[in-house]
Amino acid sequence: MKFSESWLREWVNPALSSDDLAHQITMAGLEVDGVDPVAGEFSGVVIGEVVECGPHPDADKLQVTKISLGDYSSTTVEKGELVTIVCGAKNCRLGLKVAVATVGAVLPGDFKIKKAKLRGVPSFGMLCSESEIGLADDSDGIMELASDAPLGQCVREYLDLNDVTIDVDLTANRGDCLGLKGLAREVGVLNSLEVSEPTITAVAPTIDDVITINIEANEACPRYLGRVIKGINPNATTPLWMVEKLRRCGTRSIDPVVDVTNYILLELGHPMHAFDLAKLDGGINVRFANKDEKLTLLDENEVTLKEGTLVIADENKALAMAGIFGGLESGVTNNTTDLFLESAFFAPLAILGKARQYGLHTDSSHRYERGIDPTLQHDAIERATELLLSIVGGQAGPVVEAKSDADIPQTKDVNLRRKMLDSRIGHHIEDAQVSEILTRLGFTVTTTGEGEAKVWQVIVPAYRFDIKIEVDLIEEVARIFGYNNIPNIAPKATLKMCEQKEANLSLSNLKQTLVNRDYQEAITYSFVDPKVQALLHPGQEVMTLPHPISSEMSVMRLSLWTGLLQSMVYNQNRQQGRIRLFETGLRFVPDESAENGVRQQNMIAGVISGLRVDEHWSMEKAATDFYDIKGDVEALLALTCDAQGYEFSKAEVDALHPGQTAQITKNGVFVGCVGTLHPELERKLGLNGRTLIFELLLSEVLVQKIPEATDISRFPANRRDLAIVVKEDVDAKNVLQLIEKVGGNYLIDLNLFDVYKGQGIDDGFKSLAIALVLQDTSKTLEEKDITDVIDRVVATLKTELNASLRD
């Protein structure tokens, strides 16, 4: 929407500069795209009158004129002097008021007018066209001014060219601002000024001629007004003031009738259309187009109308596409003397998208698609009638109206709560100011309650299609109050450190440990294949889904192994030889004593197969074994700072190899298990090579022992190695625990570094090589101190485990 600042100031005149006004409009949500002068920079151009006009003696296309400038005088023109100017414009004629650039004048582009001689005749200036002073891009001849234009007056002052155009890029919801009326209302509200609207009075009919109006599509056209105007002067011209206002809004002057309808569109934001009365057959009918009905538009293009297109028709034919484009056959021409003037409300949904179906986009369709004021039709037709009668003359008949009250948009009731307003804006605006803003916007406002319980009951006018709910009113109050006037307040919150128990071990630590050990995380479904699960957990009760995705995903998993092993098969089938996967998630174990009859436990599980490390020329190939995966599990348990508290013991698990399986406990509580998959299961599942697997309860490994700080001794440590011979069925773990128990405070580290069976060791026995590190924080240990500890350890091992020192 482009408009002239001076035209806007006729309605409302805030004490703001052009730039400040544009900024204010932008900050109110109506973005200004540009502010441009309405004419080029020029000086020394005044109004003159052609008092003599004759042919050039040596040029057929030139004329020699004498121009009167009235009482104007300058350094190059004396008062009352007739200025000789040679002109080539075809429309130059005797008595014409023109724009004269005298010698010394400067035109746009820094073009200076000098005395010249054209084909032997001196010329002391130039008669200017609109394009030469920057009023138009091109022109057919010199500029013709009104007959009452005062001689000698500066053209810039006469045409009020010290003006700018402001181009506003309106969003689709602000159709109410597609006219000076709506824009002025906004500026008035922003500056707390009254808006001076032009006085519109009903034009009394002087003839009785009417045309009947019938509306078949009431929902699409709830209101249609028409008026006959007869006896207009087809030779009348549009007054310069109107031409200039149209031009500054980006609209070209065509003829007085079209110019008036365009003027109403720009002034009130209401599209109108005029038909040549002589070309209408009978009454007006507002209907939808018939199948394959054709219409030649004003641009002389013929279109085949679609059945959903609303048209204005007479008894025999379609006359226009309603709200979009007029028809050529019924259009106003230079010979038109009688008019039928249309002012209608077309529903936005009836016009929306229709113009684009025909490759069109008009100022009229642009406004109807966004919605116009459904109460403005009478004002529009009366204003247009008044202007037409003053410009082209004629006699007006009575206004004929057809309407469907049930389909005309009604006012809306929306409540605005004080508590919600303050919450959304984050700033308290006084009650009186809120009421004033809403009232100035054209809303009818009543209030109830006080304080935070205050409610504004707002009746929204029908032309504000965008106001539907409470937040729409909040937006209106905020933008009119001014977003810049809302103080910047940093968010305030009561900050409290989240309690983080030092004993809590994060799951991410466990995951990262496995990733560091070359595992990759997998995510599998919680519902699994019942056949595979039955192989891993034979005889165990499962939860069956009532509506499974498929039969292969019909039960809930009893462990994470089912999904991981199927992922292992999937990857091995794609030539992946070395695979290391882990997963965390829930398992679902039926348990009548649990909530909802199911015990849901968070688990972490892993599976490995293939080589211990990737192939490399510097390393010997070695397949993974039980101790590889046990080492991975021990790395996880080490994160708890209490790895010694976990016990690995021989166990039997249905899915695992009977001789390569261990269960993990802590203080007698089951933690998990680790081992080699049963060879029979490897065969049934289609796995290649040895597969090793583990699963732990996260609840038992996500609690870590809080370490206790001890002094670092500055005295040397002493290492003593013991080779202990015990029966083969004695666990090394029991040996280490016993040594730790009797080693006393001097024992700071203990390590099993060798296990030997063979020559020199009796059958049924094994040799354990154990390193003991002894140190004191207060002194250097003497040999006697060390010997006492070693003797005590050896004696206890002999007594408790029947162990002996190896020879």
Swiss-Prot record:
Ranges where the FDX-ACB domain occurs: 713-806
UniProt xrefs under SMART domains: B3_4, B5, FDX-ACB
Keywords: Aminoacyl-tRNA synthetase, ATP-binding, Cytoplasm, Ligase, Magnesium, Metal-binding, Nucleotide-binding, Protein biosynthesis, RNA-binding, tRNA-binding
Cofactor list: Mg(2+)
Domain tRNA-binding residues, every copy: 39-156
GO biological process, one term: phenylalanyl-tRNA aminoacylation
Entry GO MF terms: ATP binding; magnesium ion binding; phenylalanine-tRNA ligase activity; tRNA binding
Documented EC number(s): 6.1.1.20
InterPro entries: aa-tRNA-synth_II/BPL/LPL, B3/B4_tRNA-bd, DNA-bd_dom_put_sf, Fdx_antiC-bd, Fdx_antiC-bd_sf, NA-bd_OB-fold, Phe-tRNA-ligase_IIc_bsu, Phe-tRNA-ligase_IIc_bsu_bact
Catalytic activity: tRNA(Phe) + L-phenylalanine + ATP = L-phenylalanyl-tRNA(Phe) + AMP + diphosphate + H(+)
Protein localization: Cytoplasm
GO cellular component annotations of the record: phenylalanine-tRNA ligase complex
Main location: cytoplasm
Pfam families membership: B3_4, B5, FDX-ACB, tRNA_bind, tRNA_synthFbeta
PROSITE patterns given in the database record: B5, FDX_ACB, TRBD
Family listed: Belongs to the phenylalanyl-tRNA synthetase beta subunit family. Type 1 subfamily.
Assembly and interaction partners: Tetramer of two alpha and two beta subunits.
Protein name: Phenylalanine--tRNA ligase beta subunit
Organism per entry: Colwellia psychrerythraea (strain 34H / ATCC BAA-681) (Vibrio psychroerythus)
